[in-house]
């Protein structure tokens, strides 16, 4: 997949993001100065399309064309989109503020896609960020703090099994940086070999050079489709994310005794499959009993050995995902699941050969000032809005480790995501870009 990085590089190079020189007059057209952005009288500062005479407008038609064009850079036929990791680097673009020595305000998302997915996940937050900054440029607005766009690599865990790989590294993932030196994909191609083949490799010991220090940005804001049905079902334009739930991933293995399905009587069985089934129900019970609707649990993988209809399972493998916005509550549920696994193994005379937590990231909380800026922007645009929890991984989860963070959601059709039917309307995208633009503008003046 050598051509879609070139397309995006062209898009960045053809988009005039470095717009404000250090000798510009900082009193000219700040947020308080340009027409169309009344801080005290919130009338709509935007036109409904780029053809309006409003000083700050979003070119929704051009943005949709870019989304459609980027969707053609895929390993699978349309309408599905497949874009898998090609580099460990992240692409950045910057518009200088009139006080460039201040820490910048950043925005961005990812453009990689799992196999046979849609064309809006992540892409709206990247191309929308470019259009948001261009809208500010067209208005004459000049930021105090510089504005940066980050294109994160490998947000999806498709190739090397690690989600948000780029943002994890930026946030100082020392353990990950070390592990990547020897990590291989399903075709036994190492991470470093894959990076070299794409022309982006660094030295083997140089991955730590991408680490960013805490407070490298004054704020990070990500625009994203909701990936759920709430906004569309309730007819709400904008979701203001207050928390990002983080999952813990658990691998469980039971070992029993196999045998012929007709030859071993029920009282004499040590069925690893039934132990797994009982644990699956225990996961549901513990999650439902957490006391919060924000706790969710999923058994996404169940494998039985030998996997024959007339054979008693001698081995069972499960992989469990537990998520919550409260880390202590999530971890308490995991402890209960572990205790249940041990009790079930004892009860059914099977062995609990593995209960391993393979990933346990902390949740993240949006910064109050970013929530307030996003809400104010939505009000000024007269858009309906609601506070929301994100239960999906996003790069913002890891950016929160080094920067104040916030997220903006827009509706998507029936909540579909990670499938070809994924869709966000041009109007909803336009609304999201407008809110992002105003939010960035507000934060740039802080």
Describe the role of every protein-language-model region.
Residues 31, 36-45, 242-244, 260-290, ...:
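His/Asp/Glu-rich mid-to-C-terminal helical/loop segments that flank catalytic regions of hydrolases
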Residues 114-116, 120-238, 284-311, 315-323, ...:
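Acidic/histidine-rich catalytic neighborhood of metal-dependent amide-processing enzymes
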Residues 1-9:
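Classical eukaryotic N-terminal signal peptides for Sec-dependent ER targeting/secretion
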Residues 55-58, 62, 73-76, 108-109, ...:
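Zn-dependent metallopeptidase/amidohydrolase metal-coordination segment
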Residues 57, 73-77, 89, 188-244, ...:
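Active-site-adjacent substrate-binding region
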């Amino acid at each position: 997949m050598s051509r879609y990085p070139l397309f995006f590089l062209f898009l960045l190079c053809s988009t005039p993001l470095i717009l404000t020189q250090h000798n510009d007059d900082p009193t000219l057209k700040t947020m308080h100065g340009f027409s169309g952005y009344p801080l005290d009288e919130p009338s709509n500062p935007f036109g409904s399309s780029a053809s309006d005479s409003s000083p700050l407008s979003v070119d929704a038609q051009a943005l949709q064309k870019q989304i459609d064009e980027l969707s053609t850079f895929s390993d699978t036929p349309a309408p599905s989109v497949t874009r898998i990791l090609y580099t460990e680097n992240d692409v950045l673009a910057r518009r200088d503020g009139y006080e460039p020595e201040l820490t910048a305000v950043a925005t961005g998302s990812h453009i990689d896609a799992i196999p046979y997915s849609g064309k809006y996940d992540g892409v709206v937050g990247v191309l929308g960020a470019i259009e948001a900054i261009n809208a500010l440029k067209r208005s004459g607005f000049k930021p105090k703090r510089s504005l940066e766009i980050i294109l994160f690599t490998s947000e999806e865990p498709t190739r090397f099994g690690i989600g948000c790989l780029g943002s994890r590294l930026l946030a100082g993932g020392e353990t990950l940086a070390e592990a990547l030196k020897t990590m291989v994909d399903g075709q036994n191609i190492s991470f470093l070999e894959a990076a070299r083949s794409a022309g982006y490799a660094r030295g083997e010991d140089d991955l730590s050079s991408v680490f960013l220090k805490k407070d490298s940005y004054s704020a990070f804001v990500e625009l994203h489709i909701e990936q759920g049905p709430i906004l569309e079902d309730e007819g709400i334009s904008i979701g203001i994310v207050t928390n990002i739930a983080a999952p813990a991933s658990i691998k469980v293995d039971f070992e029993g005794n196999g045998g012929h399905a007709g030859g071993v009587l029920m009282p004499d069985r040590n069925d690893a499959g039934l132990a797994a089934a009982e644990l699956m129900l225990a996961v549901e019970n513990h999650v439902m009993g957490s006391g919060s609707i924000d706790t969710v649990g999923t058994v996404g993988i169940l494998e039985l050995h030998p996997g024959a209809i007339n054979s008693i399972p001698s081995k069972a493998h499960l992989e469990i995902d537990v998520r919550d916005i409260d880390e202590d509550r999530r971890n308490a549920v995991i402890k209960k699941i572990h205790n249940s696994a041990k009790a079930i193994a004892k009860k059914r005379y099977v062995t609990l050969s593995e209960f391993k937590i393979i990933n346990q990231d902390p949740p993240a909380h949006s910064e109050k000032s970013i929530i307030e800026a996003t809400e104010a922007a939505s009000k000024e645009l007269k858009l309906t809005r609601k506070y929301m929890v994100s239960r999906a991984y996003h790069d913002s989860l890891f950016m929160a480790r080094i920067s104040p963070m916030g997220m903006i959601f827009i509706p998507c059709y029936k909540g579909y995501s990670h499938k070809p039917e994924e869709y966000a309307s041009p109007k909803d995208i336009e609304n999201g870009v407008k809110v992002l633009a105003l939010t960035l503008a507000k934060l740039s003046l802080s």
